[in-house]
Amino acid sequence: VSKLNNYVLPETITITNDIKEVCADKDLIVIAIPTQFLNDVILQMKPYITTQHLCIATKGMENNTCRFCHDMITSQINTTRIAAISGPTFAIDMINEVTVGLALGTKNEETENIVKKAFCNNFLKLRVTKDITGVEFCGAIKNVIAIAAGMIDGMNLPESTKAMFITESLHDVSELLEIFDGNKKTILSFAGFGDLLLTCTSPKSRNFSFGKLIGSDADAETIEAYRKNTTIEGLYTLDSIHQFGQDKHINMPIIE
């Protein structure tokens, strides 16, 4: 909220750091915290999770293991009431009620209906898939690609070069998606191509902007200051997938 200039929270929204208050007597809990903190938060939530539905808005993978958020959660909490939501939009677009589309990945029909009821309106469209792994993978990997796309932009290379890179990336992502037991078709969803297109071209994208700083030969102090003050999800995902590829002896050109 602090990064959204001039935005005032509605009176119906309460800010709290009390995990019990967040979880108790809720139908739906939306999880939108950096991946590196997820395990600790889930451990705190565990005593209070009974029949609640969980919707993951976090984009990333667990360091060292490459586990997705839904795997991290279900390893600690015995539930099938879980979904992942991802797609091409920024927080400010949601606030301004810009027409947007998101992919919803879940295998639980009741969870699907609960999330639809909470999110769907005149300006937000949800497309549902059972491929929760694919939705999460696309949401994570696009941040890595966005850093590289930003570097291309920072080096003032032609738009056609960036278009070639994004196209090649789509091919590599579809191959990786299959390795992670996702559905290749998910690459064509809001979570896949839609989010990749936005994140690789918009200056609002933190990962794209970070890559652009690197590509433009900004000094090390400027780059480090940006990294410290901004969540660059792609950096964590890059480390995780790179290690996974080395361990499994998988050729991953976009990561290398």
Give the residues covered by each predicted segment.
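Glycine-rich phosphate-binding loop and adjoining beta1-alpha1-beta2 segment
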Residues: 1-8
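Rossmann-like NAD(P)(H) cofactor-binding subdomain of soluble oxidoreductases
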Residues: 9-10, 16-24, 28-99, 115-117
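Electropositive phosphate-/nucleotide-binding environments in soluble metabolic enzymes
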Residues: 16, 32-35, 39, 48, ...
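Alpha-helix C-terminal capping/helix-to-coil transition sites in glycosyltransferase folds
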Residues: 24-25, 141, 193
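Short, well-ordered beta-strand core segments
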Residues: 29, 54, 102-103, 125, ...
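Internal alpha-helical scaffold of NAD(P)-dependent oxidoreductase catalytic cores
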Residues: 37, 48, 75-80, 99-185
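NAD(P)-dependent Rossmann-like dehydrogenase/reductase catalytic/cofactor-binding core
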Residues: 149-153, 178-188, 192-256
